[in-house]
Amino acid sequence: MMKKMLNLWNKVSYELGIFLVVLVQFITTRAYDVDAWSAPWNVLDYSMGNGSRLLVGSIYRLFYGDYLDQVEAYRYNCVGIIIGIVAVSLVFGRMIRMVIAYTPEKRNVTVGMVILYLAAPFSMSYLWNNSNIGRLDTYLFLVGMLSLLVLLCIKNIYVKMLLVTVLGVAGLAIHQAYAFVYYPLIVAAMCADVFGEYKVNVKNLVMAVISGVVEIAAFLYFQFGGGLYYDHPQQVVEVLSQRTDLPLPTDSIELEYFRDITYVQNTLLRSFFAEEKPFLQLAVVCVLLAPVLIIYVLMWKDVFAYNKREQKKLFCGPYVYVLLTNLVFIPIFAMQTDWGRWLAPLFAGQIFIFLFYLAKKDAAMYYAASKMWERVKKAPLAFAATIMWIGTLDSFGARSFQQQAWAVIYFFTHGFHQ
């Protein structure tokens, strides 16, 4: 009996440990009200239109029937977050086990990177703070984690790409932002199948391209082909007010469904760049997260050093293309003001990529992991200090990037006075 229990524990120990840590984070730090700006998407569904941002509300309606009060809406969002916690626990657990299976000596560096993620302000904890709880980002994160799990666990390329494509379309149906904030991570992971062992696998490349074309077509449809069956945002509010007591800001509905990009550029973006100093906020965030950025830079330095040492053709491997996927974030930073929501997956992506390629037995990433562990053994206190430092930082917000970054800016512009 004890042996069976021990075997069971060995099968779930990493996943359960990660799940419990993140669950405690969620229970103890979550906000208690759904974000007001995004509240309408809890009740908007396909009976009111077609296109993006209506899928989640349609699923919710299968359970609540005719009326969704604030308490029930909050519960639904919490359930979505907990499912996301399960998904990220399975992803990290699978990665750790795959690494240990072929290189047990890399266990410490693998677990260390997971701990780094869990402590960081760009971990999934950003999904439940005051700025973001109740947003559709919860489900974008979930789709991203499920896609990574597919790429990790399924070997058949046709089944793998089919599932990733279906999940990608679902992500776009949830919110078009999936194309910019989580799909780049999935493309970076797909490069492991296309450029494995420094040679192009034509079959895998064709499947990846087909998947990408479908995603682009779906994005264009959801971005430009969908809409609501109403002529004015106030009409939408009147209908929704019969279904819920959630806040229903007319501005959010008007901006998303009744205004074009020119209006956004001439009003929101102009004032955002002029008044809220986004590049200054970004610079301060980078300073606060400098220890993490140094880890990332050294990681990629080691990857390319391995390529040079082994005289590998750079563009025959996946690494340049993996780095280029980060450029896909640029349009959403240029078109939207909620930079905190986009920075979190951008920063977190490097950890997922490192662990994914390590789990896939990538030689260059294996070399980078070895060098990383050498540095940790030489300066263990530096790594411990990094974990403790980033653990003190608040999770990323939305339009206000990160609390400590704004506090630093405010101090240097206003001193001690309000």
Language-model features and meaning:
Residues V22-F26, R30, N204-I295:
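Membrane-lumen/periplasm interface segments of specific transmembrane helices
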Residues G49-R53, N108-L152, I174, A334-Y357, ...:
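Membrane-interface micro-motifs in multi-pass membrane enzymes
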Residues Y182-I210:
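Perimembrane helix-loop-helix junctions
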